[in-house]
Amino acid sequence: MIPGEIIPAAGLPLDANTGLETKVLTVANTGDRPIQVGSHYHFFETNEALEFDRDATRGFRLNIPAGTAVRFEAGDTKRVELVALAGAREVYGLNARVNGKL
């Protein structure tokens, strides 16, 4: 099995993140080292060397398959799609910018 892999029943469509708000933004790595962000990491709390509209990302994560990540090489700029966090919408730990309800 591949991390994040989903094996749906034969003939049934796979539907992920349906109905959740998404947004696309441009992210630049202003640092001198690569930064990798995992699929379920609260994007608002990513490394400070990543430059983007941080306030717009509160309550969002990368819209990529579970168990995968996006790597931002030093000096790179790329566009990413984010999806709203679901469930209880509570975030704890990470960089301690929320530590509670969104």
Swiss-Prot record:
One of its GO terms (cellular component) is urease complex. The keyword Hydrolase applies. It catalyses: urea + 2 H2O + H(+) = hydrogencarbonate + 2 NH4(+). GO terms for biological process: urea catabolic process. The keyword Magnesium does not apply. Its EC number is 3.5.1.5. Pfam families: Urease_beta (PF00699). It is an enzyme of class 3 (hydrolase). Pathway: Nitrogen metabolism; urea degradation; CO(2) and NH(3) from urea (urease route): step 1/1. Keywords: Cytoplasm, Hydrolase. Disulfide bonds: none annotated. It is found in: Cytoplasm. Its main location: cytoplasm. GO terms for molecular function: urease activity. NCBIfam families: PRK13203.1 (NF009682), urease_beta (TIGR00192). HAMAP family: Urease_beta (MF_01954). Heterotrimer of UreA (gamma), UreB (beta) and UreC (alpha) subunits. Three heterotrimers associate to form the active enzyme. Belongs to the urease beta subunit family. This is Urease subunit beta.
